[in-house]
């Protein structure tokens, strides 16, 4: 059995610069529950503490700290309170191969653990694991005032020894130092809460104390005020390295002047009546019989003392409520990010997935579901695109939606159409549109061959600009926006395949008799608009044509950048 615990201690205190592994620590903590196991573990630890390797000694102190904090209650403190010589670290102290900073960190950690054992031997109490509130004045165990003062003083001594273990944020990038620092922060939170409880208890009875006890209480309170500042700084380092530190609430630190004034007045009254025992002196009974001026002064002092007492009791009530909901630390087994008050926002940003899609706010479209009817047109939701026109003959059109494509120009044609209304004065349908064809710079235009082919791109565009139907018999007809009415059939022969069909809106005829306008916001890159205007007041007859592949790609890019959302 002895060899087992020796191997466990050696495994937990390897020379490797890393925290002790749980597979070694857990059996060691369990072994503290038996007297024989504790003896074997402490013997193995004493050997490791007398080593000359810095990491071995430092990790041995960590194991000892874990035994005090998480092992069998009181047994480790009791053992080492009678064996304080082990904390002298004679061998490593006489070696010169370690830097001064390394030795300082080792010695301060060693001194803190030694102080914990000394204070336990002096008072017989572990303030971290015992219920300190049950030992306060007026409780069942009824500590005397001297004992209460001793406990508060002991807590301040332990905290002072702890906060001397100073580490910078860069130091705590070392996982071994971070592990020890986390244990220290856990102890600091518990010790400071116990100290805060003790100070509150002393201040509650301060105005009823004897001069001797009041002076000692005032000195402890001053130390508490100074210590609070250092504790807050220490915990800020913990936040900076990612530890979850609960909000620390403590008794007010602004009572020093009031307590000193009360103590001076009480001392003067004590000197005026030396025959009366000092311990029986209270502000409520200190009434001078020499003059009415002294009588008024006593009443004033009494009211001030009562106000301070009520203030202290109210803070005590708030603190007790806060301490009941005390939070626990998160064990930083892996490096954690530093605390940021805007952490929630950063987390939301980190969770965003960027697909480099063209951003088109104020425009949403529903993807049409494939059906057997090629003339079934899905209704599109429109925000940026508003279309209001009057007509009586709807004409089917199809829209290709291509999501999740990058907004990049790859040398093909990129066009953006912008339509602006022109008033012609011809009845209700007196609006015409202006077509702006913008072609990306650095691209090639189709070669103009002057062909008479009716299906060529040049002839189709010329036909669309020249076809006007005047004198329509319908007085409510709204002339429609000129667009590029091209139907590109797929190479597979299926004219209804979604990814191969690209159609721009034909003449779209609405049933609203009120004249409207078509606004289309283009979001393309650098453009060179060429303005072409035309007027028409009748129906538009739109031919269809086969389009070369490069023109199909041009139109696909156009629709990806500015999808045409037509509401029929």
Swiss-Prot record:
Q: Does the keyword Ubl conjugation apply?
A: yes
Asked whether the UniProt record includes Phosphoprotein among its keywords, one would answer yes
Q: InterPro entries from the entry?
A: ANTH_dom (IPR011417), ANTH_dom_sf (IPR014712), AP180-like (IPR045192), ENTH (IPR013809), ENTH_VHS (IPR008942)
In residue numbers, the region (Disordered) covers 262-302
Task: List the record's Gene Ontology CC terms alphabetically.
Answer: cellular bud neck; clathrin-coated pit; clathrin-coated vesicle; cytosol; plasma membrane; prospore membrane
Q: Which Pfam family is one of this chain's hits?
A: ANTH
Q: Keywords on this record?
A: Cell membrane, Cytoplasm, Endocytosis, Isopeptide bond, Membrane, Phosphoprotein, Ubl conjugation
Which regions are flagged for Basic and acidic residues bias?
A: 262-283
Q: Where is this cross-link: Glycyl lysine isopeptide (Lys-Gly) (interchain with G-Cter in ubiquitin)?
A: 282
Give the record's family classification. Belongs to the AP180 family.
Q: What is the designated name of this protein?
A: Clathrin coat assembly protein AP180B
Where does this protein come from, organism-wise?
A: Saccharomyces cerevisiae (strain ATCC 204508 / S288c)
Q: Which gene encodes it?
A: YAP1802
């Amino acid at each position: 059995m002895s060899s087992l615990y020796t191997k466990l201690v050696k495994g937990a205190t390897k020379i490797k610069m890393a925290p002790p592994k749980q597979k070694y620590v857990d059996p060691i903590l369990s072994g503290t529950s038996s007297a024989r196991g504790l003896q074997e573990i402490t013997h193995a630890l004493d050997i490791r503490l007398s080593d000359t390797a810095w990491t071995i000694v430092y990790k041995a102190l960590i194991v000892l700290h874990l035994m005090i904090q998480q092992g069998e209650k009181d047994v480790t403190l009791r053992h080492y309170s009678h064996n304080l010589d082990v904390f002298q670290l004679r061998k490593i102290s006489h070696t010169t191969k370690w830097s001064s900073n390394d030795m300082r960190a080792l010695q301060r950690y060693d001194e803190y653990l030694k102080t914990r054992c000394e204070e336990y031997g002096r008072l017989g109490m572990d303030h971290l694991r015992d219920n300190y509130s049950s030992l306060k004045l007026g409780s069942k165990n009824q500590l005397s005032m001297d004992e209460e003062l001793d406990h508060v003083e002991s807590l301040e001594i332990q905290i002072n020894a702890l906060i001397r273990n100073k580490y910078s944020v860069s130091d705590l990038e070392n996982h071994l130092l971070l592990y020890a620092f986390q244990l220290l922060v856990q102890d600091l939170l518990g010790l400071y809460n116990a100290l805060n409880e003790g100070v509150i208890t002393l201040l509650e009875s301060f105005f009823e104390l004897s001069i001797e006890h009041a002076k000692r209480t005032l000195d402890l309170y001053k130390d508490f005020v100074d210590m609070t500042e250092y504790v807050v700084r220490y915990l800020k380092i913990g936040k900076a390295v990612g530890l979850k530190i609960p909000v620390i609430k403590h008794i007010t630190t602004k009572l020093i002047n009031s307590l000193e004034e009360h103590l001076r007045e009480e001392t003067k009254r004590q000197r005026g009546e030396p025959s009366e025992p000092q311990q029986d002196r209270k502000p409520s009974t200190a009434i001078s019989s020499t003059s009415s001026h002294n009588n008024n002064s006593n009443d004033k002092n009494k009211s001030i003392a009562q106000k301070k007492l009520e203030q202290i009791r109210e803070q005590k009530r708030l603190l007790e409520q806060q301490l009941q909901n005390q939070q626990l630390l998160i064990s930083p087994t892996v490096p954690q990010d530093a605390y940021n008050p805007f952490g929630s926002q950063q987390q939301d940003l980190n969770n965003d997935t960027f697909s480099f899609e063209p951003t088109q706010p104020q425009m949403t479209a529903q993807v049409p579901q494939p059906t057997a009817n090629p003339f079934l047109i899905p209704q599109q939701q429109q925000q940026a695109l508003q279309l209001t026109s009057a007509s009586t003959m709807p004409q089917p059109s199809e829209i290709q939606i291509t999501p999740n494509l990058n907004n990049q120009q790859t040398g093909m044609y990129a066009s953006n159409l912008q339509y602006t209304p022109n008033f012609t004065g011809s009845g209700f349908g007196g609006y015409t549109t202006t077509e702006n064809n913008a072609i990306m710079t650095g691209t090639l235009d189709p070669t103009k061959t002057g062909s008479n082919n009716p299906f060529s791109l040049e002839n189709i565009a010329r036909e669309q600009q020249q076809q006007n139907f005047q004198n329509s018999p319908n007085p409510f007809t709204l002339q429609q926006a000129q667009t590029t009415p091209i139907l590109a059939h797929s190479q597979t022969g299926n004219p209804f395949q979604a990814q191969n069909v690209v159609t721009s809106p034909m003449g779209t005829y609405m049933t609203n008799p009120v004249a409207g306008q078509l606004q289309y916001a283009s979001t393309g890159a650098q453009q060179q608009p060429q303005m072409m205007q035309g007027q028409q007041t009748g129906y538009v007859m739109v031919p269809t044509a086969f389009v070369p592949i490069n023109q199909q790609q041009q139109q696909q890019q156009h629709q990806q950048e500015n999808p045409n959302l037509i509401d029929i």
